[in-house]
Swiss-Prot record:
InterPro entries: GIY-YIG_endonuc, GIY-YIG_endonuc_sf, GIY-YIG_UvrC_Cho, Hlx-hairpin-Hlx_DNA-bd_motif, RuvA_2-like, UVR_dom, UVR_dom_sf, UvrABC_protein_C. SMART domains: GIYc, HhH1. Residues 208-243 form the UVR domain. Residues 506-520 have a biased composition (Acidic residues). The keyword Cytoplasm applies. The gene is uvrC. Belongs to the UvrC family. It is found in: Cytoplasm. Interacts with UvrB in an incision complex. This is UvrABC system protein C. Pfam families: GIY-YIG, HHH_5, UVR, UvrC_RNaseH, UvrC_RNaseH_dom. Residues 16-95 form the GIY-YIG domain. The UvrABC repair system catalyzes the recognition and processing of DNA lesions. UvrC both incises the 5' and 3' sides of the lesion. The N-terminal half is responsible for the 3' incision and the C-terminal half is responsible for the 5' incision.
Length: 743
């Protein structure tokens, strides 16, 4: 355990200015980031008598091996830098307000000619407007189904829209008046966009105006004796009122605000946030954060309050709204939709309330108020959110108790069954997927403490063991194993070279051939040997290197041949501290290298259940990547081969000319009429389509090398139309140890 006095800065070297500091452990990892009005006062508090420090702070300073700081001009700048560093380094001793799931939102693709409404989970995209988040996807679908009779906008995918446009008939929603059927020209693009804009206005809270307009149209239709239209409008008004009933008014003044509440114990804190727009609750989200290893700057806590809640509130505000502003900025939403409301209601004000309020105002672009509700509707709503937070914490503790017990039992059972030195806290599993030797891919999934660590998942495109319609599953397992562990050995070699003062010619984490989420190769940069834990950290960033941590248990999906192949690779690389097993399907036998008979785990054991989940997750991940790779190959376009021609400009070309066949007949001058297409690009397009003989000066956009495009044959393209499936051949994709199909 490091002694804080060994890395304490010399007296007088710490400035008294405001700034941000970070503690690193002996391996260079950033473990805590904090800010202070006076760096000297704050940092000196960490180097007091260790026995007088709070237990969480004591754990942090005894884990750290060094401290660094950066001086800033203002406290608001310190707040921004602290947020950026926490986001970049993900320190283990900082509270991280991250959702434990991706909440569904209602997305409106305003960047398309015919905007689409759909339920969405995932990163924000430019030109798409989002409403939510919501707790359940079914709630969005129920409301959307109710509103489609009033706002019959498109909800189908691009493929469905194109198909019905080609056949000239609308889908079922078009026949039952829940879609205006722009695919068959029932409404124009401008009319359809007006419908979508009215829908967005309704969800944004501008409801009274829309209801009054419908009522006026209903009255006019009635006066004109058009009772059928009047009855339909009457039903539309009723549908809107039912939708409004689902969102009861909670703040009578039509306030736009977020209401946050916290429920804490000694180890964890539950956070609940209600998003109120136009006086109605439009969304809700909640999560639980760990406090067991989190440091609170007790010197900054009001001793009279005797609580760490103000610091938790400050960390929540900076992290949560920093992420929201970043997402809204990436989505290029309208002004005022930065994700930061005009008012944020919190249980207590943060210590630096004025600076936090100024920072939030900068994110929004207009004034933001931080308030503690004292009476009335806002106080009542805050109490409701607080009850939700307390209930969420209680439910989380109940689930965690049962889940932690079962995971501990599973890991201990695996250790005993396989006679391991310690419980396999990190398990990696590899699986192979292909269709009759084509599009051969592999997946590698990672479980830590019995839970999936999806940020460490990796894809591989098999190269050496596949090709020309052949596939050797055993050789594929060996290839993936070699590439995975060569990467680790290379990191060891890089660290040793850096320690020896090697120059920048050595391999780095980004050069050479690397494992990526697609299909990178591996090159060896190390000399094998036992795995060194210090190789796991990039000294430049303090963050873990990709694939740097070795597993305690390496699982292959298969039987004795696959296990023998993986074990032989590890022996070849000199790796001795990684256990290898194989899990065969059907009988669920656990194969160990060098053993003639498999290990049989009880069918009802938690250990077998954990291994099955790991294996099935690898199988799912491999098949997902295989399908994606196969789909890209089967829907390839001749334009894909034009270097420098991206997806946006490809779509612009096809939209302008109508098809690849017509594009092929166009001249260079006609192609350059498309915005963003220059002469060199136009020549490269015609060369790729085989419209003229390829020449050296049109090899690609901005490329002086010889032509690499060439005409695309029917074998690759399969059709003149871009990105149209050309058919599916062979049986469904199969895994290395399951030949019965993808599923």
């Amino acid at each position: 355990m490091p002694d804080p006095s060994t890395y304490r800065p010399a007296t007088g070297t710490i400035p008294v200015d405001p700034g941000v500091y970070k503690f690193r452990d002996p391996h260079g990892r950033v473990i805590y980031v904090g800010k202070a009005k006076s760096l000297r006062s704050r940092l000196n508090s960490y180097f007091a008598d260790v026995s007088t420090l709070h237990p969480r702070t004591r754990q942090m300073v005894t884990t750290a091996g060094s401290v660094e700081w950066t001086v800033v001009s203002t406290e608001v700048e310190a707040l921004q830098l602290e947020y950026n560093w926490i986001k970049e380094f993900d320190p283990r001793f900082n509270v991280r307000y991250r959702d434990d799931k991706t909440y569904p939102v209602l997305a409106v693709t305003l960047n398309e000619e015919y905007p689409r409404l759909f339920v969405y989970r995932g990163p924000r995209r430019k030109g798409v407007r989002y409403f939510g988040p919501y707790s359940h996807a079914w709630a969005i679908r129920e409301t959307l189904d109710l509103l489609l009779r009033v706002f019959p906008a498109r909800t189908c995918s691009a493929g469905v829209f194109k198909r019905h446009n080609q056949i000239g008939r609308p889908c079922l929603l078009g026949y039952i008046d829940k879609c205006s059927a722009p695919c068959v020209g029932r409404v124009s693009a401008a009319e359809h966009r007006k419908i979508v804009e009215d829908f967005c206005d309704f969800l944004s809270g501008r409801t009274d105006k829309l209801v009054r307009q419908l009522e006026a149209r209903m009255q006019q239709a009635s006066e004109e004796l058009d009772f059928e239209t009047a009855a339909r409008l009457r039903d539309d008004v009723g549908a809107l009122r039912r939708a409004l009933e689902k969102q009861a008014v909670v703040l009578g003044d039509g306030t736009d605000a977020d209401v946050a509440a916290f429920a804490t114990d000694e180890l964890e804190a539950a956070v609940q946030v209600f998003h109120v727009r136009g006086g109605r609750v439009r969304g809700q989200r909640g999560w639980v954060v760990e406090k067991a290893g989190d440091v609170i700057d007790w010197a900054a806590v009001d001793s009279a309050a005797g609580s760490d809640l103000p610091l938790l509130v400050e960390q929540f505000l900076t992290q949560f709204y920093g992420e929201q502003a970043a997402l809204s900025g990436a989505a290029d939403q309208e002004a005022g939709s930065s994700g930061v409301p005009r008012e944020v209601l919190v249980p207590v004000l943060p210590p630096d309330a004025e600076q936090v309020q100024e920072w939030l105002s900068g994110l929004r672009g207009s004034a933001v108020r931080l308030r503690v509700p004292q009476r009335g509707d806002k106080k009542a709503l805050a109490e409701t959110v607080q009850r939700n937070a307390m209930e969420a914490l209680q439910q989380h503790k109940l689930r965690r108790a049962g889940d932690f017990t079962s995971r501990s039992a599973a890991l201990q059972g695996i250790q005993e069954a396989l006679d391991l030195d310690s419980a396999p806290l990190r398990i990696e599993c590899v699986d192979i997927s292909h269709v009759q030797g084509t599009d051969v891919v592999a997946s590698l999934v990672v479980f830590e403490d019995g839970l999936p660590r999806k940020s460490d998942y990796r894809h591989y495109a098999i190269k050496e063991a596949a090709g020309d319609g052949r596939s050797d599953d055993v050789a594929s397992i060996a290839e993936v194993t070699r590439r995975r562990f060569l990467r680790h050995n290379r990191d060891v070699g890089v660290l040793r070279a850096e320690a020896a003062g090697a120059d920048g010619d050595q391999a780095s984490d980004t050069d050479g051939d690397q494992v990526s989420d697609t299909d990178g190769d591996q090159v060896s940069g190390g000399d094998g040997g036992d795995l060194a834990p210090e190789a796991a950290i990039d000294p430049q960033t303090g963050r873990p290197r990709r694939f740097a941590y070795p597993p305690n248990l390496y699982v292959v999906d298969g039987g004795a041949p696959q296990v023998a192949a993986a074990s032989a690779v590890l022996d070849e690389l000199g790796i001795t501290d990684v256990a290898v097993i194989g899990l065969a399907k059907r009988l669920e036998e656990v194969w160990v290298p060098g053993e003639e008979d498999p290990v049989i785990l009880p069918r009802t054991s938690e250990s077998l259940y954990l291994l099955q989940r790991v294996r099935d997750e690898a199988h799912r991940f491999a098949i997902t990547f295989h399908r994606s790779k196969r789909s890209r190959r089967m829907t390839a376009s001749a334009l894909d081969s034009v270097r420098g021609l991206g997806e946006t400009r490809r779509k612009a070309l096809v939209t302008h000319f109508g098809s690849v066949a017509k594009l092929k007949q166009a001249s260079v001058e006609e192609i350059t009429a498309v915005p963003g297409i220059g002469t060199a690009t136009a020549k490269a397009v015609l060369t790729a389509l085989g419209a003229e003989e390829p020449s050296a000066d049109v090899a690609g956009v901005g490329d002086d090398e010889p032509d690499r495009t060439g005409p695309v044959t029917a074998e690759r393209n399969g059709a003149d139309l871009p990105r149209e499936p050309v058919g599916q051949h062979g049986p469904a994709a199969q895994s290395a140890s399951q030949r019965t199909g993808v599923e």
